[in-house]
A protein has these predicted regions:
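A short beta-sheet element
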Residues: 664-726
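Long recognition/docking surfaces used for binding and targeting
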Residues: 195-296
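Active-site metal-binding core of divalent-cation-utilizing nuclease and nuclease-like domains
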Residues: 25-67
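Nucleic-acid nuclease catalytic cores
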Residues: 83-134
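A short glycine-rich beta-alpha junction/loop motif
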Residues: 495, 702-709, 738-759
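Conserved S-adenosyl-L-methionine
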Residues: 302-420, 427-428, 435, 448-449
Length: 779
């Protein structure tokens, strides 16, 4: 007869032999709990549906009270997990999930389900449910117990847990920013104040004393502690760095009003220090720097644009950084690239403390020109465990700085150069970085898209210089809103360059479309990985890059010249295999909505088809055509909305996709000079969110001059036009604010269309296909 006590004993014995249990680091309870909070949460957790219920085991970590483990056991492996996981009384997984659903209201819960009576034939499942969520996910290897330390580490480094904690940190950054604003701390000093508190909190004497000191005494103690901690560093600029913190002693509120400075330090310890301890080598200060400057009146004057942490980590993987890498960032900022590089190198060092010391003292080199940011960088590196003695204050173009860096023989360059610098173009910073690297080393940099698109002028000369001396290995087009949190409207590309090896003739550079990193914007908390997509996306990107895979709609290899556009959008093919009737139906519905709003009649029964014949979309038999071979392209004539006379007769079509481009309705009589003839396709040529889209205008209209143009063809009617709009919209990913749909880019854009027996566009098929879809009778 099955005996559940046998199953329980396997786990009990395992825990009683665990180091955490022996060292008294946990509270181990069976089928009950003395913890008031846990007991209250389980008061209605009976598997029978009423009253209290307890799992077989509950484990609490004394130093991590927000995390608990619950364990549920069944003797027979056939009762391990039900299909729908809703038979709580009979199945191990189901029961564990029930308890977790109650406990996760206040705790992060690791639930372990165990079944079986034979030690070598146990079934073991692990799931993690985070506090305040109703979702859980599988974690750890199935059918194996792990040491409690591994369970704790796995929980602390779980991607979803990190995202949750990071969101809490960002929320706190907003609260802290508001508090510092109230306390009249200037935006440019806020990050320094936080970094100073974090440095001082490393000192045991300061930690023990700061809560009991008067404001003036505390300000003095804070500055002195920072000085004592940083003076160990062999850096000739250390006195300048310490001087940066002197504002704390003279600040009217911080140094005089009771508890203000103390409360800031206390909250920094609780919210930021704990995060840094858990997630080592993450540029936490950089995130606060971004937040503090987000609402500043003059953020560009105050500082720089910081690369998001998931991208700094991506750079390290692109560059294959390991324990022997020597990394230089000549535009260091707050040190995000160096911190990510240090993390990768230390992981690769595998616990070798001597090697770790060498990494921090000799293999991390940074250069920063701005004084306040240099101070912040040094502090940031201290917080993350040294690595600060090789930070150089100055310009990366100074000969003295160049010679100093070369002594270290760097073999990896990582940088995000200043955008729009008055003295030097972005590619100049990259060429400068390349001169510092050993031959065959890699430089990975992120630059405005305009730098890689240049066909004329100084930037073209820089592109020529780059190919004459180095190899352009890869270029990746990055998400349009990557720097949204920094309030910077710039479309960027990442370039990968092999140093000091001339670009070989006929060598194919790899181009990748890396526009979707899985991050989304929220008004209250900015751009983040809310849906935990980034890990898989990054894995796919890196695999494709390392294997140089050419994937339709994602990547392509191309032999390039300096005057070419160095971006995937110029060369990648559109993936027509994803085209379905839904794409066409949406265009039809959008056009009908536009007709209603622009005062046009919509007849027939809503949703009806004009014919019931079924047509297939066999895109393999279609042929490519240039846009200029299909359309006669003309400019639109509209002016700004301020000069137009409003009315109800004629639509003003702007650079937008929604509502068929409709911006406003105008009077026809008083705007004659701006009117374009209807029955045409309108190409939206500019605009961060709409460049590359098209609309169909059945009647005369006013188009936004300079941002739209129109295409005419005698075969065009409203049915085949909507077919064409659907096809043309597939080209949208190739265009953006940084790469407009103008000139030859528009004329030479290739689209794939059905053809007739003479290999010409099959206008009749396009018309008939639209007529076979719902709502076609309402057109």
């Amino acid at each position: 007869m099955a005996n559940e006590r046998i199953t329980e004993n396997f786990f009990r014995k395992f825990i009683l032999q665990d180091e955490f249990y022996i060292q008294d680091k946990i509270i181990f309870e069976e089928q009950s709990s003395k913890d008031i909070k846990i007991d209250k949460l389980l008061k209605n957790a009976s598997k029978s549906g009423g009253g209290k219920g307890y799992p077989e085991f509950i484990i609490q970590f004394k130093e991590n009270p927000d995390f608990i483990i619950v364990v549920e056991c069944k003797a027979d492996t056939k009762f391990h997990e039900s299909k729908n996981r809703d038979k709580y009384k009979d199945y191990a997984v189901d029961g564990a999930l029930l308890y977790s659903s109650f406990l996760s209201k206040e705790f992060d819960v690791l639930l372990i389900a165990i079944s079986g009576e034979q030690k070598n034939n146990l079934r073991i499942s692990h799931f993690l449910q985070l506090k305040g969520t109703d979702q859980y996910h599988s974690i750890f290897t199935e059918d194996k117990f792990l040491p409690l330390e591994d369970y704790l580490n796995g929980y602390q480094t779980d991607e979803r847990k990190f995202n949750q904690d990071f969101q809490e940190l960002l929320k706190y950054s907003k609260t802290l920013n508001d508090n510092l604003h109230t306390l009249k701390v200037p935006e440019s000093n806020r990050s320094l104040l936080i970094s100073g508190a974090l440095i001082a909190l490393h000192d045991k004497a300061f930690r023990n004393a700061y809560k009991y000191q008067k404001p003036k005494e505390l300000a003095e103690n804070l500055i002195n502690t920072i000085k004592n901690k940083l003076t160990d560093v062999q850096n000739k600029h250390i006195e300048d760095i310490i001087t940066s913190y002197s504002f704390i002693k003279t600040h009217t509120i911080l140094s005089k009003q009771e508890n203000k400075l103390r409360d800031i330090i206390e909250s920094v310890d609780e919210k930021i220090n704990n995060f840094i301890k858990t997630y080592k080598y993450f540029d936490t200060l950089g995130q606060f720097y971004i937040e503090f400057l987000r609402y500043a009146n003059n953020d560009k004057g105050l500082g720089i644009v910081l690369t998001p942490p998931h991208i700094t980590e991506l750079f390290c993987e692109i560059a294959n950084i390991n324990k022997d890498s020597v990394v230089v960032d000549t535009c260091t900022g707050t040190g995000g690239f160096l911190i990510s590089a240090m993390k990768q190198m230390i992981i690769d060092a595998g616990g070798d403390k001597k090697k770790e010391l060498n990494i921090k003292s000799k293999q991390i080199i940074g250069v920063e020109l701005q004084h306040s940011i240099f101070s912040l960088t040094c502090s940031n590196m201290y917080i993350h465990g040294d690595g600060r003695s090789n930070l150089i204050k100055g310009s990366c173009f100074d000969e003295e700085v160049i010679e100093e860096i070369k002594k270290y023989k760097p073999n990896v360059g990582l940088l995000n150069p200043p955008y729009g610098d008055k003295k030097h173009k972005e590619l100049e910073f990259i060429l400068n970085n390349l001169t510092l690297l050993e031959k065959g080393s890699y430089c990975v940099a992120i630059v405005p898209m305009s730098s890689v698109l240049a066909k004329t002028g100084e930037e073209l000369l820089l592109k020529k210089k780059l190919l004459s001396n180095h190899t352009l290995e890869a270029v990746f087009s990055m998400p349009t809103e990557l720097f949204h949190n920094s309030k910077v409207n710039v479309v960027t590309a990442v370039i990968v360059i092999k140093a000091k090896e001339k670009h070989p003739q006929n060598y194919k550079t790899y181009f990748g479309y890396w526009k979707d990193d899985g991050f989304y914007k929220k008004k209250t908390s900015g751009r983040a990985d809310y849906y935990n997509k980034w890990s898989q996306i990054k894995k796919l990107w890196l695999e494709n890059y390392r294997n140089k895979d050419e994937v339709i709609g994602h990547s392509v290899k191309k032999n390039i010249q300096p005057s070419d556009e160095w971006c995937v959008e110029a060369y990648m093919k559109t993936d027509y295999s994803k085209l379905t009737s839904d794409n066409f139906s949406k265009v039809i519905r959008d056009f009908i909505a536009f007709k209603v709003i622009s005062n046009k009649n919509v007849q027939s029964e809503m949703g009806a088809k004009l014919n019931n014949k079924k047509y297939s979309l066999d895109t393999n038999k279609w042929k490519y055509f240039n846009i200029e071979d299909i359309f006669s392209i003309k400019s639109t004539k509209g002016t700004t909305t301020n000069e137009l006379v409003e009315g109800y007769e004629i639509p003003y079509i702007a650079a937008k996709k929604t509502l068929n481009g409709l911006e406003m309705m105008c009077s026809k009589e008083e705007n004659e000079q701006f009117i374009s003839e209807g029955n045409c396709i309108v190409f939206i040529q500019l605009g961060a969110g709409s460049a590359g889209y098209t609309t169909y205008q059945e009647d005369d209209f006013i188009g936004m001059s300079g941002k739209t143009s129109c295409g005419y063809n005698d075969n065009l009617n409203k049915y085949n036009a909507l077919f064409l709009v659907t096809i043309l919209d597939q080209e949208r990913p190739k265009f953006s604010f940084g790469r407009s749909w103008t000139g030859d880019r528009l004329k030479l854009t290739k689209i794939k269309l059905p053809v007739d027996k003479n290999k010409n566009p099959d206008w009749q098929f396009m018309e008939d296909y639209i007529k076979s879809l719902p709502y076609s009778s309402n057109l």
